Each structure stands twice: as structure tokens, then as C-alpha cells.
């Protein structure tokens, strides 16, 4: 899905009109939904419902006040989900990981990158902008940050186990 609102200027500029977010699922999925934040240039939230988990992919605003409102909206999406959740993406937490504190407390979620290892820029990481957050019904078995430069952000690779199984 395109991450910018349909009437937005960025959606029509050549560089930005080709940018998007995607989720790939090996075993298929039960449902996909596209949510849009009310504010910010980057508004798309992809929701993918798997057999036992709901996954949300996000790219939050560069502006802190807008980001905080987006996190409140995301908090509601997590609360409305019937299954344990994983929320992942570029949170643009320019003020640091503490920006997620309210979101994590309100949702009861944990973050996979507990050491706050920098993820941006990929060629010389010095900022923690990207996160994977997960419900307590999931157990994080492995977390890695491969040192690759396919993007300006390092990928976060997680292996989860469903504790309710």
C-alpha cells in the first residue's frame, strides 16, 4: 500500500509515489486491512491477521506531536485486535526509545530491541528509529540486526513463539 494520503502532494511526486510498505507471509493470512492515521505525511498502517497473531506495519511521522497522536491511534488498533499483536516498523523515534514508553505501558507490549541497538543509518548506525513490539502472549526467542545496507535502516529480525499454544 502507498503510505501517503490519496490527496497528498507527496503521493504525486516521482520519488515518493514509488515508495510503499509491504508484508510477506509464507503460509498466507486470514485477513488484511489498511488503516490510515488522521495526521502526518506517512499515514498507512498495514494490518495482517495471521492464524494466531495480528501484525501491524507502520511508518510514523518525523514530527513528534504527530507521532504521539499516531501512537495513540495505534494503541487503539492493538486494543481492538482479538489476537496477540506484533507492531513493527520505522517509528522515527528521533527523541529516543523513551518516546514509546506510553505506548508500551498502555498496550502491555514489549520491545524486541531491549538493548536499544541503533538501526539508522544502516552504514553507520547511531539512532534507534525502528522497533518491533510484541504482546506478552508471545515469547521472543531470537532478535538480530543483520549488518546489511539494502536500505537506509537496518532490518530487525525476530523469531517468536506463541505462549498460548
Model-based region annotation:
Residues 31-36, 79-86, 92-165:
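Metal-dependent phosphoester-hydrolase catalytic domains
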Residues 47-61:
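Active-site-proximal beta-strand elements of phosphoester/diester hydrolases
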Residues 1-51, 144-147:
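Structured beta-strand-rich core segments of catalytic domains in phosphoester-bond hydrolases
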Residues 11-13, 38-40, 61-64, 92-94:
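Short, catalytically relevant binding-site loops at active-site mouths
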Residues 8-10, 26, 58-61, 89-91, ...:
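Active-site-proximal beta-strand/loop segments in catalytic clefts of secreted hydrolases
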Residues 66-83:
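A long, amphipathic alpha-helix that forms part
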